[in-house]
A protein has these predicted regions:
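Charged, compositionally biased N-terminal leader segments and the immediate start
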Residues: 1-24
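Active-site C-terminal subdomain of aminotransferase-like
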Residues: 288-400
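Flexible, glycine-rich loop/tail regions that form catalytic "lids" or insertion modules at the edges
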Residues: 8-15, 82, 100-101, 375, ...
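Conserved PLP-enzyme active-site core in the AAT-like
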Residues: 162-326, 408-411, 415-419
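Conserved PLP-binding catalytic core of the aspartate aminotransferase-like
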Residues: 393-421
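Gly-rich Lys/Arg/Thr-decorated short loops/hinges at beta-loop-alpha junctions or inter-strand turns
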Residues: 115-127, 145-150, 178-180, 201-202, ...
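Short loop-beta-helix segment that forms the pyridoxal 5′-phosphate
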Residues: 125-129, 133, 146-166
Length: 426
């Protein structure tokens, strides 16, 4: 911030912009000091912090007060922030890799994302009081179970990479009879998912084996060598669509747990993972109306088959009745929670991304099943139109089956193509 002239016009009203954001004004500080029996806020610092830590001034400890320019008025601060932001180069993102541009309906933006009643309580501290929030999370859970065709979903996790690593840990807990501490993952995972899974595996002593799950000659020997689970992206990070059911069948035969990492929007068109043999489904719900936000935060999802209910991380919302016999929402299976299970818990008060799960649920309600399918159809139709145009231009599109991500073989010209796209604003 630059130096600002004091607000002499009196246009900000009785409570200036600075006091709303900086904190207590001088009169407040004086009152606080008198109430607790000190002469000034500086005395609190001198009494609490060792003299060796404070700045020395002529042999005596003193508190150095930073020198700041006068506080800016709201309009001035906004203008300066706009000026700073104008230095950014705004382009259209085509990279994908788990983050996709989406439209947030204005009714959701106004009434949820910009509504402090929703965004201040980012997780239900006293959940049963927040019946409206629990109702929206119930809708979110139903959305996930409907699209994945699995029995139960939690009310969100922190992000897709976290959900994938939590799925790995769930598989290790659930496959107790499997003596092999090996976990198989597809070679074509999103980078952030691979990094988090590998990091979590290293900390917990799990051996992660990367193999091409689309090639039986690659994955079959690894499964036969023993594993407690597998993580199969559907579609994978290259955009390729494939059927993981053969891999899932093989892993089940050795006692392992199967995890499908799915694009939620694509599941409005594709066969659900529950019908392909997945025990667990994970992924991101960012495409359901949540802005990219420079990479996050985004609500992840996890759903599981029957029998894994007590292994799933994240909060579970159920429907019960109150003292008068009326329907009421409450958290269910709380024996998994930290306040009961302590260090053995699979869930705690922050194992969620509630606000953005609410946004995703509202997005699904706003568009309805037909609207979601129409959006997915538009996305994949445009991707196939682009692929056809690229083939007509002489480029080699690597995969015939895809949802919305296209891989192009450029025969050594990738850098030139990248530069031309960047010059064009992409």
């Amino acid at each position: 911030m630059t130096d600002h002239a004091e607000n002499r016009c009196g246009l900000e009203g009785p409570r200036p912009f600075s006091s709303r954001h900086v904190g207590s004004v001088e009169d407040d500080l004086r009152y606080i000091a008198e109430t607790i029996g000190v002469t000034s806020p500086e005395q609190i610092i001198r009494d609490a912090i060792p003299a060796s830590v404070l700045d020395s001034n002529e042999g005596e400890s003193s508190v150095r007060t930073p020198s700041f320019p006068p506080a800016a008025a709201e309009t001035t601060a906004r203008a300066e922030l706009v000026e700073i932001a104008s230095g950014n180069r705004v382009t259209r993102a085509l990279i994908g890799r788990g983050y996709y541009g989406t439209l947030t309906p204005s009714v959701i933006r106004r009434n949820i994302l910009e509504n402090p009643s929703w965004y201040t309580a980012y997780t239900p501290y006293q959940p049963e009081i927040s019946q409206g929030r629990l109702e929206m999370l119930t809708i979110y859970q139903q959305l996930i179970t409907d699209l994945t065709r699995l029995a139960l979903a939690s009310s969100s996790l922190l992000d897709e990479a976290t959900a994938a690593s939590e799925g790995m840990l769930l598989a290790r807990r659930a496959a107790r009879k499997v003596k092999f501490n090996r976990f198989l993952v597809h070679t074509h995972l999103f980078d952030q998912v691979r990094d988090v899974v590998l990091g979590h595996a290293e900390a917990t002593g799990i051996e992660v084996v990367e193999t091409d799950l689309r090639d039986p000659q690659s994955w079959r020997p690894e499964v036969e060598a023993g594993c407690f689970g597998v993580l199969a992206p559907y579609p994978d990070s290259t955009g390729a669509l494939w059927n993981p059911s053969e891999v899932f069948d093989a892993v089940h035969k050795v006692g392992g747990i199967t995890i499908a990492e799915c694009d939620l929007l694509s599941l409005t068109l594709l066969a659900p993972p529950g019908e392909l043999g997945a025990d667990v489904a994970v992924g991101s719900s960012q495409r359901f109306g949540v802005p990219m936000g420079n990479g996050g935060p985004h609500a992840a999802y996890m759903s599981v088959r029957s029998g894994l209910e007590r292994q799933i991380p994240g909060r579970l919302v159920g429907v019960s009745t109150d003292a008068d016999g009326n329907p009421a929402y409450r958290l269910a299976l709380q024996t998994r929670e930290q306040h009961i299970r302590r260090d053995k818990a699979t869930s705690n008060i922050c194992t969620a991304q509630v606000l953005l799960a609410v946004v995703a649920a509202a997005y699904a309600v706003w568009h309805g099943p037909t609207g979601l399918t129409r959006i997915a159809r538009q996305v994949t139709d445009r991707a196939h139109q682009l692929a056809s145009a690229l083939r007509a231009a002489g480029l080699d599109v690597a995969d015939q089956q895809f949802f919305d991500t296209i891989r192009i073989r450029t025969k050594g010209g990738a850098k030139e193509l990248w530069n031309r796209a960047r010059e064009g604003g992409y």
